[in-house]
């Protein structure tokens, strides 16, 4: 009988942990916050890119490729690096033409159940084909994309199971602390 108890307890414990979609879900059940790591957010982004956006009435296609998310040590903002391609007049937009980097806070959006960029800033742009500098049209395209993306697209989406477990809780704030994204829960 004793031999059966230990395996049953272990199986129950593993099943309970597996039911939590992330380590942050355990915190939601036990505490007042959810925590997410940069690799968790990166995994979500990897499934959502590359993305193509037709701009200027379809004359130009902006392709945003290869997202790389990091949380710089001691920072309250995350960093997103992207490759970018511009397609026009037969040029393939999926061929990287350059790179840009964004710094941003995060906010929770109830409509998408996701973490969205909050007050993103375009930190750097490098387009070697333009001599390393970005012309006004290219910068405008990236800034328009960034505004649309921050408004409409999450960089991470909480799954239905996690949302069910925290349904009785209110999301008070989203911060970046000690290299992690922290969603603070209220009553």
State what each model feature region is:
Residues 1-20:
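Sec-dependent bacterial lipoprotein signal peptides
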Residues 20-187:
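Extracellular/lumenal and peripheral-membrane lipid-interaction modules
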